[in-house]
Amino acid sequence: MAKRIIYNENARRALEKGMDILCESVAVTLGPKGRNVVLEKKFGAPQIVNDGVTIAKEIELEDNIENTGVALIRQAASKTNDAAGDGTTTATVLAHAMVKEGMRNVVAGANAISLKRGIEKAAGFLVEKIAENARSVEDSTAIAQVGTISAGNDDEVGQMIANAMDKVGKEGVISLEEGKSMTTELEVTEGMRFEKGYISPYFATDTERMEAVLDEPYILLTDKKITLVQDLVPVLEQAARAGKPLLVIAEDIEKEALATLVVNRLRGVLNVAAVKAPGFGDRRKAMLEDIAVLTGGQVITEDAGLKLETAKLEMMGQARRITITKDTTTLVAEGNEADVQARCEQIRRQMDETESSYDKEKLQERLAKLAGGVAVIKVGAATETEMKDRKLRLEDAINSTKAAVEEGIVPGGGTTLAHLGPQLASWAADNLTGEELIGATIVERALTAPLKRIAENAGQNGAVIAERVREKEFNVGFDASVNEFTDMFAAGIVDPAKVTRSALQNAASIAGMVLTTECIISDKPEPKENAPTGAGMGGDFDY
């Protein structure tokens, strides 16, 4: 296919145009008075969202080069979402502001490589400052505040997430389910999550989210590698007769046996899924035993004289619900409380006896998985469209609270970045020279972009608000919900430091890459040929 090659200014301008379109679409959602965006779907009802990364993923432009710009800035949002689970709109607005500011300097003749170096050094300084100004999260009030802000100022959601964290602990798991009622409810159950996903994507029952969900399944636990399909047949037949799904957790499943499971799943003979056992060596056996205790089953191991071909349903574990993604498996089981407590006690004793800090850490992980449990938030809404929107907001809120527990909280509403601008300017003046100093200035000017946009979405003059915030103390910012300046910590308007840090780092990374772009090579669109006459369906036939 023929290629289209664009150089210098034209290349950067085309990228910038794509970024402008994406940033404007995403930025309208920023802040307490941010609006929603409606996504048209080929199938099903339109989706109304307020989530930056979801909007960014939907945007595809006709022009290939502009689309490249969209893809680059989308990466800033996606990476921030992967690292911190929230802050995607902030990352997009920051990256766009840095690129805009940087373009002016490149056009004026500045060396793009030196600018990039300056941007990187400025980002490094700001990351340190964010960590310095972060407050650790000690009580559930702070957790509730973070959840409330992230869920779009929904106090009920913030309180619910704080309650969930109280019950399952900081190491526990909080998952989301679509509820059956109009109200959002919290349900805490025993459960466990481990970092192994399905072996084959064909096991996914929900292809949109790429998840496999098994309700009330049997669980086959074994520490051996399953190579022959004959080993599995007796168990598969028993599970099919019982009419329940089956989850196989084994060291590995070879091609032939795996193909049999996939075929059974696709033909609808048996709802089955397979995951590799978590951990390695002796720790794998211990974790399989943990799962067995939790689910009331047995590990089919030759050490205990048990073989797969003689396994009975009574030896299987059982769970209420199992959710498997490509990376994780979450088991929600009920009952067996006495056994679980005894197992937890045993792990605690092992922790007391061991002297290795690594072993202690791994035992602590196992204890958290066993004792922590899983909190399930059942999302309620009047319509399916509202349900999807609430679910996305809740997902952001849960990720934010976890990020806050990890690295602490900073003043929210774009306040932290705006206040760090003058500190960056004085540091850069002392430590950087020439075009590297200009690179740091690019970052410094971009730092007020999120605050300006929050103010503009609330109907205020962004530039004026940003200047007034910078004149005040570090914790004082602009509360766009009531159009007042206030102490952000006192008002409960806080952001997780991890979210702010990730947004800044990813924005700086993308901006540096775009500014150093000198040439773009893309496929030249082929002219569409007109279809020959009479080639449509139907032709000369009578029906």
Swiss-Prot record:
UniProt-recorded Gene Ontology molecular function terms: ATP binding; ATP-dependent protein folding chaperone; isomerase activity; unfolded protein binding
Origin: domain of life: Bacteria
Alphabetical list of Pfam families matching this protein: Cpn60_TCP1
EC number(s) stated in the UniProt entry for this protein: 5.6.1.7
Reaction equations catalysed: ATP + H2O + a folded polypeptide = ADP + phosphate + an unfolded polypeptide
CDD domains in UniProt: GroEL
Main location, first listed in the record: cytoplasm
GO terms (BP aspect): protein refolding
GO cellular component, one term: cytoplasm
Cellular location(s): Cytoplasm
Binding site for ATP: T29, L30, G31, P32, D86, G87, T88, T89, T90, G413, D495
UniProt keyword Nucleotide-binding present: yes
Keywords: ATP-binding, Chaperone, Cytoplasm, Isomerase, Nucleotide-binding
Keyword Cytoplasm part of the UniProt annotation: yes
EC top class, as a word: isomerase
Chain intervals for the UniProt region annotation (Disordered): 524-543
PANTHER family linked: 60 KDA HEAT SHOCK PROTEIN, MITOCHONDRIAL
Task of the protein: Together with its co-chaperonin GroES, plays an essential role in assisting protein folding. The GroEL-GroES system forms a nano-cage that allows encapsulation of the non-native substrate proteins and provides a physical environment optimized to promote and accelerate protein folding.
Subunit: Forms a cylinder of 14 subunits composed of two heptameric rings stacked back-to-back. Interacts with the co-chaperonin GroES.
NCBIfam families registered for this protein in UniProt: GroEL (TIGR02348), PRK00013.1 (NF000592), PRK12849.1 (NF009487), PRK12850.1 (NF009488), PRK12851.1 (NF009489)
Family per record: Belongs to the chaperonin (HSP60) family.
Official protein name in the record: Chaperonin GroEL 2
